[in-house]
Amino acid sequence: MTFSQTGLRQATVVHKVIHIVVLRNNHRPLIHFFREAGGTPLSVSATVPRMDTSPPLLGDADLPGPICLNRLHSLGVVCKLDNDNAYSYHDSRTLYGRASIISTLMPSRSVACAGTAAWVWLGGMFPNTIDIISKAHYRTARYGRKVSVFNRQAPDEHVTDVGPITVTTPTRTACDLAMNCTPETQSPVTEIVCMLMQEFRFRPDDCLQVMQEATHIR
């Protein structure tokens, strides 16, 4: 066997091991990760739970070393939140998965709103801040993200429970984003609001109704 063949085989084995490490305690189906990376699934037991109850974030304790996190990020398997923590792109594919990820980052007894709520509803690039409705103030960053607190009134009709979190409805989320955008953020905010309206089928009249019900939305 030549050196190049040996190196290729070692690289393939390492590539597969990295993917297996991500599946802590075999809670997630292996086939999804191997298909993402274009690999061939290993022969494993099919008796895996339907619901993944493992924590949605990966940390140092879940991986052999810090190099693994960077490697997984470069492979497109995980999204890094900071130098020590990340979440799986596989988990972020569903509404419940995104809510579970956000629940780990959000302070207790708070409501996800604005950009954070938009990510829960739509997915996409993870927001730079954790936007919440709360009466408390948080000065410490969480997983590399600043906690942005909005001390607003949120009627029961404007929030809903998604898995483990409470989040503003798509209509209220669009209003929060539109009423608080700046000239610098107007273009991306407009795109997000249009996506929310298209995905969840609400109209400008619905937004006007929300604004009438919450006079302190700004």
Go through each PLM region and give its residues.
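Short gly/ser-rich loop at a beta-strand->alpha-helix junction or flexible surface loop bordering the NTP-binding
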Residues: T2-G7, I18-H19, L23-I217
